[in-house]
Amino acid sequence: MAGNCSWEAHSTNQNKMCPGMSEALELYSRGFLTIEQIATLPPPAVTNYIFLLLCLCGLVGNGLVLWFFGFSIKRTPFSIYFLHLASADGIYLFSKAVIALLNMGTFLGSFPDYVRRVSRIVGLCTFFAGVSLLPAISIERCVSVIFPMWYWRRRPKRLSAGVCALLWLLSFLVTSIHNYFCMFLGHEASGTACLNMDISLGILLFFLFCPLMVLPCLALILHVECRARRRQRSAKLNHVVLAIVSVFLVSSIYLGIDWFLFWVFQIPAPFPEYVTDLCICINSSAKPIVYFLAGRDKSQRLWEPLRVVFQRALRDGAEPGDAASSTPNTVTMEMQCPSGNAS
């Protein structure tokens, strides 16, 4: 197999690693394919401006989520997850914005190259962290809805914060190992190891994380459907969890197809690199919109504060009008539990 352009570009001798590849394409290279199997045409010049505009909009949205979920809204187990998810998405979008900004100008020298390499490493780490948080959110939400009494009685204190810390640590370790084999060992010494790391990352993302986020969502949908037959209104938090998982699955289709076709059938990628990266940026930018749409009160014609909208998106249980005929509201149960359980 010829030289592999891994998830992150090689730190030295880039021309040898990716001969004939334009700088723009090299920056947007996702890395699953060898140079012989990716298109040599660079992305359109307008792509950099689209990336920058999308990243800036996503940074504003995730910044609002960080502010309201972190300082303005009472902490709940799931607001902790969404807080870390917004942090991962915000840092990822910032790294992509830096790369797009460098791509738009003629920045030469060692310092811009160093910034590009650091931005790629940070982007990979935060992308992995954001994806790994989705299974944790899906599983915990599924358990809290299907087994509410058991969940709130047995739930360890500070579970959300502990899980988020472990997932960030896992992301840091995986990214460090990947960059050790694909960047610091040198291209000649790390070719096979870097290739195996790319395969391992794909297996981890598509064959472990995706099932772990999809199966709990399916169980949640079945449970919500059963409640709908009893005329019980579903919690808005269920809609939020299902929506953010669906957005990720849709936005990662192109990346998954490219990876699957190449590693299973040895078929070149049918989609340009910048298309898959654009979809991932859309995924990172869309979550604040999901929170807003889920928390918006359709009957409220006047403008509502964003704090109220985001707080309503975290509503866990039936609407007030249905409280008498619904199962125990997990928000009420949360208020009855020690404050440490909301961490």
Swiss-Prot record:
Keyword presence, Transmembrane: yes
Ranges per topology, Extracellular: 1-44, 105-123, 182-198, 264-273
Tissue and organ expression note: Gut, vas deferens, uterus and aorta; barely detectable in liver, kidney, lung, and salivary gland. In the brain, markedly abundant in the cerebellum.
Segments on the Cytoplasmic face: 67-82, 145-160, 221-241, 295-343
InterPro entries from the UniProt entry: GPCR_Rhodpsn, GPCR_Rhodpsn_7TM, MRGPCRF, MRGPCRFAMILY
GO cellular component: plasma membrane
The entry's keywords: Cell membrane, G-protein coupled receptor, Glycoprotein, Membrane, Receptor, Transducer, Transmembrane, Transmembrane helix
Gene Ontology biological-process annotations: G protein-coupled receptor signaling pathway
Main location: membrane
Pfam families: 7tm_1 (PF00001)
Keyword Kinase: no
Glycan attachment sites: N4
Molecular function per GO: G protein-coupled receptor activity
Region of interest (Disordered), ranges: 318-343
Bilayer topology: Multi-pass membrane protein
Localization per record: Cell membrane
Membrane-spanning intervals of the chain: 45-66, 83-104, 124-144, 161-181, 199-220, 242-263, 274-294
Compositional bias segments (type: Polar residues): 324-343
Family recorded in the similarity comment: Belongs to the G-protein coupled receptor 1 family. Mas subfamily.
Role according to the record: Orphan receptor. May bind to a neuropeptide and may regulate nociceptor function and/or development, including the sensation or modulation of pain.
Protein name as catalogued: Mas-related G-protein coupled receptor member F
Species assigned in the record: Rattus norvegicus
